[in-house]
Amino acid sequence: MGSNIVIYFSIIVIVTLNVNGVPASDLFKSVSQYHIPRSKVINKETVTKPLQFQRAICRLLQKLGEETFARLSQSELEAKQLDLIKTCYQANSFGDNENQGHMQRMDRNYYGWMDFGKRAIEDVDYEY
């Protein structure tokens, strides 16, 4: 019961507040920009099934990485990747120490962006 409350609270925070400096409204603007229907990211089903919502956020971040970050310099790329990696893992983390520790390890052991969305989705699937 307690974990359900934390999960739904996480969804509300993602939808209404800034997540690691990336406003949720910017994520949804990007959904329109890349012609991904808003309903694919959040709808009645994803609100009642938090795992699907988290996976949709990871897919969106992967799409943004593929199309946007290709035009950035290497230093800009690394800074933005790290921010969005944190955002994605916050979307998947419900505050337990294991997830937070994994996010910190990712900070230190950065791996290529193009593969990140796929790995993040696999990590979420594995945890559940």
Curated annotation (Swiss-Prot):
- Any single Pfam family the record assigns to this protein: Gastrin
Q: Which GO terms describe its cellular component?
A: extracellular region
Sulfotyrosine is carried by which residues?
A: 110-111
Question: Residue positions of the PTM Phenylalanine amide?
Answer: 116
Query: InterPro entries, alphabetically?
Result: GAST, Gastrin/CCK, Gastrin/cholecystokinin_CS
Compartments in which it is found: Secreted
Q: What residue ranges constitute the propeptide?
A: 23-108, 120-128
Record's signal peptide: 1-22
Ordered alphabetically, the record's keywords are:
Amidation, Cleavage on pair of basic residues, Hormone, Neuropeptide, Secreted, Signal, Sulfation
Protein name (Swiss-Prot/TrEMBL): Cionin
Q: Which organism is it from?
A: Ciona intestinalis
Its organism's taxonomic lineage begins at: Eukaryota, Metazoa, Chordata, Tunicata, Ascidiacea
